[in-house]
Amino acid sequence: MNIDETKIEQAITDKTKVIVAMHYAGVACEMDTIMEIAHRHGLKVVEDAAQGVMSSYKGRALGTIGDFGCYSFHETKNYSMGEGGALVINNPAYNERAEILREKARTARNSSAVRSISTHGWTSATAICPVS
């Protein structure tokens, strides 16, 4: 049920920005291949590790290999807390942007982050109402 890494490159277009690797039922995606493809094409990798809690790939916890790791806390996931989730960031350069997203662009704990917001839109990462 995981992404077929042999089909990723043929799906990449000039509009592609990220590769999303969803680890299902604790089975890891082929992350070495995915990371190599992403590097070659200048893409980021987002790991959906909500179903990969406590699982690993070559000794590394799922959700910590790509540029970002995501964990859902929805009631159907391994860690059920009703709603919400967690974001793992492997590059401190994204910390400020993550703070803006966490606050849905309404407020931010860092005042410089608030000043950096210039527009809001449905497809912008700073949308006031997150798309679900």
Language model regions located:
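Loop/helix-junction capping segments adjacent to catalytic residues or to phosphate/diphosphate-binding pockets
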Residues: 2, 28, 79
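Catalytic PLP-binding core of fold-type I/II PLP enzymes
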Residues: 5-20, 25-59, 91
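Active-site region of PLP-dependent enzymes
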Residues: 52-58, 65-132
